[in-house]
Amino acid sequence: GDCYMAVCGLPYANPAHADPVAALSLRILKELQLFNQHNGTHLKMRVGAHSGAVVAGVIGSSKFIYDLWGDTVNMASRMESTGIPDQIQVTEAFRDQLSKPFNLDFRGELEVKGIGKVSTYFLCDLPEEAA
């Protein structure tokens, strides 16, 4: 498919999970920009992030797969699907977990199916002095 999920803090909770997820998201977008410059392509990507508890486990009887379920997974998916190309859209819950001074811009409140209004932000960068 054209959608990939990355997680941090499994199988054990990691209270410092948001910073590496934010840094990875920024790095992926930067690498995509460099790829486009070097190859004359115009590939675009949306990234969404949310923080919270998930249910995780292995399913299957002949072909096993490790999978995740729950409201947190659904919200992260909504952040990606309602995002803007070449932007990282995050929830307030994710923003509140950041310990480094990442720059964020308030996008506004989005109506999220099955949840209601959710405050969202665009993750812009991490100032050099804080990296």
Model-derived segments and their meaning:
Residues 2-3, 24, 97:
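Short acidic/histidine-centered micro-motifs embedded in hydrophobic/aromatic stretches
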Residues 70-71, 89:
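Residue-level recognition of alpha-helix initiation/capping sites
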Residues 54-56, 63, 76, 82-131:
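Cytosolic regulatory/linker segments at or just downstream of nucleotide-handling modules
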